[in-house]
Amino acid sequence: MIAGTANGLIDDLPWDLVDYPAAGTIFDHLTSNGIGWVNYHNVNPTRLLLKRSLGAAGLIAARRIAQLGRLFPAIVHAERGNKSFTAGLYPLGLAGAVRHLRTTKQFFADADAGTLPPFSIVDPDFGDFSEENPQDIRKGESFASEVVKHVLHGKGWADTLLIWTYDEHGGYYDHVPPPAAVPPDDVLGRDLVLAWPAWLRALLRPLLRAALTELTNADAGPTSYDRYGFRVPAVIVSPYARPGYMTSTVYDHTSILKLVQQKWNLPALTRRDAAAQSPLDALDLDGEPAFGQPPDLPAPSLAWGPW
């Protein structure tokens, strides 16, 4: 969703993310063209960067000393959510993302005041309320409801488009077979660890035994990116959204890139987003906005934190 390609990676383990897409990410294109953007996250940016710099092992050790009695799995779970944010997926791009990080609390304030930047990404806490198993999905729904509510009733509502979506299907069955897709590039699926010399992998095997087994199994799968995955929900929230609009057009996550590129006349990152369908057809920009007056939405089953 940020680069239009997986750049051949078949996992997101830290030692693989030192790679970087040849054409960069949408954040690189926005920055080079002077277009403001912010990645909002549930953790204060200073703490977030410290966590990423220390790495999981060092941070866990520090937490064990400072908070005796806490269980190791609980710490790992917390740090997983605390360290993950969209703009920092590739560590090589972390330095350029630093000044674009803000807290979720700041997003609510900016949305209320109508001072959101031209482009924003709002991340959940991937450890506690991203609706992933085994989380309480009501927390994720409550977070999404809170984000939508602040956009709906914020001073910038008349000029805002929010796309609420998910990065994966979550394990639910889909009766529709995924169709073929345009390959983003010519980079085949591979794992950087499996490309290491055999002697190095043998040396590190005691430390990475489970990961190496998992990667070996994954590496036996498809190596091309020429097919979509299972469908995921996507909701358009805008004054100009077409009421009750349904479409059979095939979209994917790079459709968001396509929309951003259309708005600011930016070049495509890969063949995939160049061929993507833009979700503009879900908007009616010619007439009066159907939702100029924000609708009242039902409250979520679980009120927004603290939990």
Regions found by a protein language model. Name each.
Residues 1-307:
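N-terminal pro-sequences and low-complexity stem/linker regions of secreted or lumenal proteins
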